[in-house]
């Protein structure tokens, strides 16, 4: 049993938040007790510093708030919560939402269209999410909406716009860009061969470097067994940046489970 921090954010009724239940999602069960305790401490501070805003009738209870906070803090478990500076609100729709999108084509004509979005983030603005896709982020499938949007926030700490290169030492930028573009090309080649729907990694990763970093960050944490062997050099760069090794964590958890099973009488 994990011993939680004494100072826990409490509801209006002074009820302790349900961290133990919040941690029970598959994505977080591989963490050690020490990592889970550290993650809860960060998530507790996250809920103190950020405002979660439910929209369009979405009901936000304490368990949902805890799980949202835990997923936000997983990528910065070793980086620190200050890496999530730059926004103060998380807006949460019940389902994917419609936005007005404006874009300029190659000859300078401006177009407007309404599109359905799962999430959005801006450098100095709120993060916008939807609960249906947040729920789909609880497992180890390679999809994680919150980690995707957090990756964009981490990316923009390195400049005015997301580039696919987070804040890393300058001497490592060229190697990062080389490995990231190699991964994009590899994913694009698979798409051309088998089609977007049959591709083993989300085709969105091939659209541009910023999306490649965000999508592969999802796989880094929730499907490391797909990412690591396919892009080993880039995997090591992600491990150095996030200061975590989810594949090693997964193997350790599996070994522990196997040992426990063999010692059951």
Swiss-Prot record:
Q: Which cofactor does it need?
A: Zn(2+)
* UniProt: Zn(2+) binding residues: 111, 148, 152, 211
Q: What are the entry keywords?
A: Aminopeptidase, Cytoplasm, Hydrolase, Metal-binding, Metalloprotease, Protease, Zinc
Annotated coiled-coil segments of the chain: none
Compartments annotated for it: namely: Cytoplasm
Q: Name one GO cellular component term.
A: cytosol
The answer, when asked if Zinc is one of the entry's keywords, is yes
MF term (GO), any: aminopeptidase activity
User: According to the record, how does the cofactor bind?
Assistant: Binds 1 zinc ion per subunit.
Enzyme nomenclature, EC number:
3.4.11.-
Tell me where it mainly resides: cytoplasm
**A biological process term (GO) from this entry:** proteolysis
- What does this protein do, in the record's words? Involved in the modulation of the activity of the glucose-phosphotransferase system (glucose-PTS). Interacts with the transcriptional repressor Mlc, preventing its interaction with DNA and leading to the modulation of expression of genes regulated by Mlc, including ptsG, which encodes the PTS system glucose-specific EIICB component.
PANTHER family named among the record's database cross-references:
MTFA PEPTIDASE, PROTEIN MTFA
Subunit: Interacts with Mlc.
Spell out the NCBIfam families in the cross-references: PRK15410.1
The name on file for this protein is Mlc titration factor A
The scientific name of the source species is Shigella dysenteriae serotype 1 (strain Sd197)
